[in-house]
From Swiss-Prot:
It is a multi-pass membrane protein. NCBIfam families: PRK05454.1-1, PRK05454.2-1, PRK05454.2-5. It is found in: Cell inner membrane. Its EC number is 2.4.1.-. This is Glucans biosynthesis glucosyltransferase H. GO terms for molecular function: hexosyltransferase activity. It comes from Pseudomonas syringae pv. syringae (strain B728a). Involved in the biosynthesis of osmoregulated periplasmic glucans (OPGs). Keywords: Cell inner membrane, Cell membrane, Glycosyltransferase, Membrane, Transferase, Transmembrane, Transmembrane helix.
Amino acid sequence: MSNSLPVPMSLNEYLAHLPMSDEQRAELAGCTTFAELHERLSAQPVTDPAEAAQASVGRRLTLTTADQLEDAEMLGVDASGRLCLKATPPIRRTKVVPEPWRTNILVRGWRRLTGKGNPPKPEHDDLPRDLPKARWRTVGSIRRYILLILMLGQTIVAGWYMKGILPYQGWSLVSLDEITRQTFVQTALQVMPYALQTSILLLFGILFCWVSAGFWTALMGFLELLTGRDKYRISGASAGNEPIEKGARTALVMPICNEDVPRVFAGLRATFESVAATGDLDRFDFFVLSDTNETDIAVAEQQAWLDVCRETKGFGKIFYRRRRRRVKRKSGNLDDFCRRWGGDYRYMVVLDADSVMSGECLTSLVRLMEATPDAGIIQTAPRASGMDTLYARMQQFATRVYGPLFTAGLHFWQLGESHYWGHNAIIRMKPFIEHCALAPLPGKGAFAGAILSHDFVEAALMRRAGWGVWIAYDLPGSYEELPPNLLDELKRDRRWCHGNLMNFRLFLVKGMHPVHRAVFLTGVMSYLSAPLWFFFLVLSTALLAVNTLMEPTYFLEPRQLYPLWPQWHPEKAVALFSTTIVLLFLPKLLSVILIWAKGAKGFGGKFKVTVSMLLEMLFSVLLAPVRMLFHTRFVLAAFLGWAATWNSPQRDDDSTPWIEAVKRHGPQTLLGACWALLVFWLNPSFLWWLAPIVVSLMLSIPVSVISSRTNLGVKARDEKFFLIPEEFEPPQELISTDRYTYENRWHALKQGFIRAVVDPRQNALACALATSRHRQAQPIEVVRMERVDQALKVGPAKLGNQERLMLLSDPVALGRLHERVWSEGHEEWLAAWRASIEADPHAPLLPLQPEGKASEPVPV
């Protein structure tokens, strides 16, 4: 529907949404057409009325920010003379060439035989070979051999105990001659108990070795933190107060994709202001690298970027770019940054969408890089904070209390051949560009294509090139947030599971350091241990059924004088069970002991932290079987080729509805009940051993829902349960993040795309930031006209997201659509725009709105 409004009336409404004085509005109110209005706003003649809105973009954009934009030289023109906003620095391209993967060892061997296996090194290869071999490399190798001996020795002893517990003691009494003379059914019945036992014993050995690795890691971390005598810690390489060299420029890059915009830019602003407080802001630039494909969120990002630059005077320091082609997801986003601007910086700090880092932490990372010339990556240990649901608070408490032990333990065993977790870390740009670009995995299927979990692979490539990868486990000032509930965590786990399984294809790639081969293996075991545990339990139940339902064979050989009795040693079972419990829960007890020794005030005191630990242990016991079944499903889905979506995890407090919980956990509850009934029917006494599993599954629905409640989390915090030091005495960066998040939500942009089309100021910003700036060409003009006509024909409600993205990226099409909506009076668009303003209780007060519409936020 068009032409529903007389031009003067709609023109007055248009002027009311421009930040002008009454005199300026009165002067422009005499215009008879919108083309004339835009011509007078632009103060230059307009030959084509269809381009009138495009001509006035500069004036509409700079009505309130002219001084700041001009001082920072943010305004420019493209090749066609259209105004654009310099949201990114000038491009200085650097070559980024990924090396193709050769994952097939047979093909690699053939290439070596034919003389094609060793391609020439690139000329720019500048590995730090002139540096002396650091002593830590030898020490790290010795430590890892010790760890391997401890793990295997512990596993062998436990396996021996497990073998003694099982009722059938080995295969020695199974006669091959007897088997060959029996029917297949008789052979199967005779061999089945032994086959089940052997499978159980094998799975037990793998799982116990996995638990043992975690135990020794936590134990060494405990000793490191208790004594404080770690001469190889990377944070000791710098005195901490050296001036940062002028050439040591660092880019803070934040890749985002359909994220919570108020929270993202609140954390960015808090980090920016913290860096500014150090006096070293001139050494840092900030980049928001968006892969967002939801147009409403994309427009909100544009406005949030403009607001944070205006409020912090960050024009020319805080940059924003949204990619139109989302190639290789997050790693491709970083590749694009390195290709366009990476050559301008010596270092890069990667931030996640929920990351917050203090200025002291960031400047310390730069100093550590300067003091350690062979370090390629230094990873901080982010501390979780900022969430209020009961589930998130327990996870925050667990990572804050137990996490330091495991992180310090990882450093003890790995030293400079450690992990990189993809964010809150500093990276040396030159070797990263030259060696860490990721080619897609060859082949077809679920484990081919773009690498999903890029961080472990980039660390492995950095180490393969001769650079160290360190964890600065004792460096404060690095923060992140956790998913608010179990289901959101599991969504994230599905992506991580698929990514880690893909990475294992690189296990035998030439040149990888053994430590990073082990990292690929542990990444797989993080999720593969779930189906192994599940199959272990299933086989144990099957063995119980065999022992209960099948008549035991006491005489296996002819003329056997004495029967072969199945053996049962309950004392060994209790001893092995107790040992396993110690390995699982002793690290948590050691964590609390360490807090007692160092000071428990920030955790609510000794009593509260101990009770919190016990409650968290109970909660982890309830959730372990639930995670086991979900992870088993994820592993099977990956191997079967079911697609894993890459939606961003929920980063705000969010309760799980009962319907959603029943949908997700209902099959688990049913499985737990049926499993319990089966075991009770077979042998009621065995149900006590299986009770922690089946009871947890049957309680999964209420546990998932209740733990996601914010009110319970807040009440626990008020009672000082699950308290962490970042809540007891919050750092300024987190205080600022909370305050800015609240303020940003108060003024958050709703219905962003409709605003970008209709609103005079929002349209100017969207046109100035649009990146599809083609030169004049007839085919392009035809496509633009078709897109604008289609948008006007179907209206905002029926316009698809892909069509919206095309319009948002094209400044000419967006300007023409804006001009025609107003000049032709397309009521469907105008009504949607007015409704979006009416639905926003905190919209700026405008002359045509009733008094009392807007009010100022009251920070909490």
